């Protein structure tokens, strides 16, 4: 929210100083401190509570984005955090899959997502991008939005560091990567249909081995 809708941030979050803990040398998990924190949250209308360091980090990220012209181009104006439902979106007479997406933001010709990451730099985020299947996610988001009649020509990610110094970077996703992501989600959806219909018992892939070779799924 600090990134997408900073004007609403204060309405949903507040901060409490560690010095306010009844038991100073204990964490907030200690019963006395936990009870105090829950009471403060109730007094603040159920807002989410952030530590002072978390609150300052959010403020820093917001300030930096305000000074980044790419943020103004991408985020303002844009539709933010809206859900789209597509019933019977994939499948045939043998079975269908319903789809729900919730893109962080989009506008005419642009789809975008915000990702918290340990490594917002190009080398580090490249690894995380494929590890967590962001190519699959964004390819699916783009197709559903297009099915809703939205023109999406450019797909981008805002990668925000989740640790000091909380740097950020914008990345445009190439078309060939999105097409590969589409192949992956189509394959995944086809597997879901097969498993739902009982046409496949291969629910865990082609094999699995844990770190200690304790269990191996045999394929005959």
Q: Which positions does each model-derived feature cover?
A:
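Metal-dependent nuclease catalytic cores that hydrolyze phosphodiester bonds in DNA/RNA
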Residues: 1-100, 206-210
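Residue-level signal for well-ordered alpha-helical scaffold segments within enzymatic catalytic domains
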Residues: 2, 6, 110, 140-143, ...
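Hydrophobic/aromatic-lined pockets within catalytic cores
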Residues: 4-8, 116-119, 146, 150, ...
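Short histidine-centered catalytic/ligand-binding loop motif
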Residues: 46-49, 123-133
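Secondary-structure boundary elements
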Residues: 70-76, 107-113, 146-153
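Coil-to-beta-strand transition motifs
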Residues: 98-100, 107-109, 152, 164-166
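Conserved catalytic cores of phosphodiester-cleaving nucleases, focusing on short active-site segments
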Residues: 101-127
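Metal-dependent nuclease catalytic regions and adjoining charged, substrate-binding loops involved
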Residues: 128-135, 140-220
């Amino acid at each position: 929210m600090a990134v997408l809708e900073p004007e609403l941030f204060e309405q949903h979050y507040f901060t409490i100083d560690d010095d306010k803990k009844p038991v100073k040398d204990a964490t907030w998990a200690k019963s006395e401190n936990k009870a105090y924190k829950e009471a403060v949250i109730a007094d603040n209308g159920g807002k989410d509570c952030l530590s002072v360091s978390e609150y300052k980090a959010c403020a820093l990220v917001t300030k930096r984005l305000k000074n980044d012209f790419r943020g103004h181009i991408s985020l303002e104006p844009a539709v933010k955090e809206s859900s789209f439902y597509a019933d019977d979106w994939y499948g045939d007479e043998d079975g269908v899959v319903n789809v729900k997406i919730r893109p962080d933001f989009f506008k005419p010709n642009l789809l975008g997502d915000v990702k918290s990451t340990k490594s917002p730099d190009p080398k580090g985020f490249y690894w995380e991008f494929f590890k967590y299947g962001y190519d699959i996610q964004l390819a699916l988001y783009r197709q559903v939005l297009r099915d809703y009649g939205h023109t999406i020509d450019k797909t981008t990610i805002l990668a925000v560091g989740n640790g000091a110094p909380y740097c950020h970077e914008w990345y445009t996703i190439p078309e060939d990567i999105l097409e590969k992501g589409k192949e992956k989600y189509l394959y995944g959806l086809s597997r879901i249909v097969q498993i739902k219909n009982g046409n496949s018992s291969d629910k865990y892939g082609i094999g699995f081995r844990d770190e200690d070779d304790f269990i191996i799924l045999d394929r005959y």
